[in-house]
């Protein structure tokens, strides 16, 4: 009733006050803070001013070492450090190895499945929900609208039978045959399961699936098999070195026993990622560096090296994608300062797994946001709506935190439900009077379908401009005693992922899928010739 009271009154209020030409300005406890996340991120990007910095590195024995000092904020400081190490020998000061284990990724709940499908296949949250719902209705996977990544203990005796029924995965299931399946607390924990457990296969043989359904089923199947495999064992090597007083470092990672990673070894795409925000490009580079295998170094060895001082530029935050937005909604407590409210949001964030896809789709339908490749871009309508909302609480995740806390207090009989409703009515009344006191004639811009089409056409020219800008502002290297190799400028073919999953216009049977350089039809094996190259 709380969502209805707030949404019904606030939507009518803002529509009548600031809408135009039958435009509906919908307001909601989850919808509006979600839009605010996108708008605020976009404003951060628009106002971002890149700043130069310099990184000192050197190549010793075909291995790139980076100065441990990090970034130099002035070129003079970097050149001074460069001059210190020029023509001086590089010495290895320490070599350390540390073995570690990497546990299999957790089973899927709905949000993590939507995140993975968006990251890997560019499927929207709504599209993934529809696909997994289809698999569930065909009894191939379990109930999908779940918010847990655990199984209850009573599922354990059924797991061997489920694995046996999974056709097409025999090469991965065979090593588990005849053995007692491990029962890990990372997988089986009844205390963390409410009405439904994590999404897993049912053991019913999967046949006659579309390509998109097969992709989703394959993610679930491999994840289920992987949890019964041993940990991946690896060794991390860290090598420290110095030239004069300047210290350098490089790290490498060697897989000793792949364990569960065997399940993903033949896939061209990357193995599952941890549940964390999308890393920046520099973090991506660091991750790739750490995963490389290093040559053998010995403490005390020394020799010539090739130093490089590289100019780089700070980069703006990344636009939200559906994957990162879903994670932000799930972990919305991090946007709240009040510790009590943050704790209330910790368990569920804003929205429920089953409703988040619908919330995002509503933002699209209202023309508050649009897609640009994978990125979510706020339209003029979305930006102006957030700017015009008077009550900051309506735009904040704190509102959900306040409600969650009060609902828990009601559950523990510390607070009366009637008081909650009365307070909510009072809050809505204050919101109404606050807006009515605005004597301006402001109106929120209407973003039409034609506006979205123009934006789509405009961005097709963007890759060329971006490439030119990138070439003009690319990192420059200042080297002495050695010339740096120029890096060729590259650009990816641009793509419009919004057509993925739509019905093929040629055969009418398949759906549009995304390849490396073009879109095609999932029915291509049966002769459909539909193909559209990326622009």
Residue ranges and their predicted role:
Residues 1-99, 193-249, 254, 258:
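Phosphate-backbone binding and catalysis cores of DNA-processing enzymes
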Residues 21-24, 97-106, 115-121, 144-152, ...:
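Conserved short loop/turn motifs at secondary-structure junctions
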Residues 33-34, 112, 130, 219, ...:
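Short amphipathic alpha-helical face segments that pack within enzyme cores
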Residues 47, 125-126, 147-535:
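Basic, low-complexity terminal or inter-domain segments flanking catalytic cores
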Residues 48-65, 91-131, 321, 341:
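C-terminal accessory/connector segments of nucleic-acid motor ATPases
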Residues 87-103, 306-315:
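Positively charged, polyanion-binding regions of nucleic-acid-associated proteins
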Residues 138-144:
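Secretory-pathway/luminal and periplasmic proteins that interact with or process carbohydrate-rich
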């Amino acid at each position: 009733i709380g969502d209805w009271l707030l949404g019904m009154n606030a939507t009518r209020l803002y529509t009548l006050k600031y809408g135009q030409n039958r435009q509906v300005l919908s307001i909601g406890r989850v919808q509006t803070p979600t839009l605010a996340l996108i708008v605020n991120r976009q404003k951060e990007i628009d106002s971002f001013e890149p700043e130069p910095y310099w990184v000192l590195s050197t190549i010793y024995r075909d291995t790139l070492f980076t100065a441990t000092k990090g970034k130099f904020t002035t070129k003079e400081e970097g050149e001074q450090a460069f001059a210190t190490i020029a023509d001086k020998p590089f010495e290895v000061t320490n070599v350390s190895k540390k073995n570690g284990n990497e546990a299999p990724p957790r089973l899927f709940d709905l949000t993590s499945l939507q995140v993975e499908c968006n990251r890997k296949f560019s499927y929207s949250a709504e599209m993934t929900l529809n696909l997994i719902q289809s698999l569930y209705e065909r009894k191939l996977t379990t109930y999908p609208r779940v918010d847990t990544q655990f199984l209850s203990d009573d599922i354990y005796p059924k797991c061997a039978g489920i694995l046996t029924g999974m056709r097409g995965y025999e090469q991965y299931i065979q090593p588990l045959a005849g053995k007692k399946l491990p029962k890990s607390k990372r997988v089986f924990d009844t205390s963390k399961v409410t009405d439904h457990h994590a999404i897993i296969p049912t053991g019913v043989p999967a046949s006659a699936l579309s390509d998109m359904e097969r992709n989703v089923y394959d993610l679930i199947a491999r994840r289920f098999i992987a949890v019964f495999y041993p940990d991946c064992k690896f060794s991390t090597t860290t090598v420290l070195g110095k030239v004069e007083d300047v210290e350098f470092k490089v790290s490498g990672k060697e897989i000793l026993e792949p364990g569960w990673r065997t399940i993903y070894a033949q896939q061209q795409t990357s193995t599952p990622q941890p549940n964390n925000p999308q890393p920046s490009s520099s973090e991506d580079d660091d991750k790739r560096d750490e995963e490389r295998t290093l040559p053998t170094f010995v403490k005390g060895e020394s020799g010539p090296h090739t130093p490089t001082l590289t100019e780089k530029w700070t980069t703006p935050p990344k636009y939200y994608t559906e994957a990162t937005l879903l994670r932000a909604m799930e972990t919305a407590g991090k946007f709240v300062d009040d510790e009590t409210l943050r704790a209330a949001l910790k368990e569920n964030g804003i929205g429920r797994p089953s409703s988040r896809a619908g919330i995002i789709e509503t933002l699209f339908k209202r023309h508050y946001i649009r897609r640009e490749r994978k990125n979510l871009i706020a339209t003029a309508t979305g930006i102006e709506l957030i700017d015009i909302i008077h009550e900051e609480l309506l735009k904040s995740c704190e509102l959900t935190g306040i409600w969650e806390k009060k609902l828990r207090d009601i559950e523990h009989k510390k607070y009366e439900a009637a008081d909650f409703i009365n307070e909510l009515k009072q809050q809505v009344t204050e919101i109404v009077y606050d807006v009515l006191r605005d004597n301006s004639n402001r109106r929120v811009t209407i973003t039409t379908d034609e506006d979205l089409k123009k934006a789509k056409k405009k961005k097709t020219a963007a890759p060329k401009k971006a490439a030119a800008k990138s070439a003009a502002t690319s990192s420059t290297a200042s080297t002495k005693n050695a010339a740096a190799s120029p890096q060729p400028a590259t650009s990816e073919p641009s793509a419009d992922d919004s057509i993925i999953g739509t019905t093929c216009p040629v055969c009418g049977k398949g759906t549009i899928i995304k390849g490396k350089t073009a879109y095609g039809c999932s029915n291509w094996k049966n002769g459909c010739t539909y193909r559209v190259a990326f622009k």
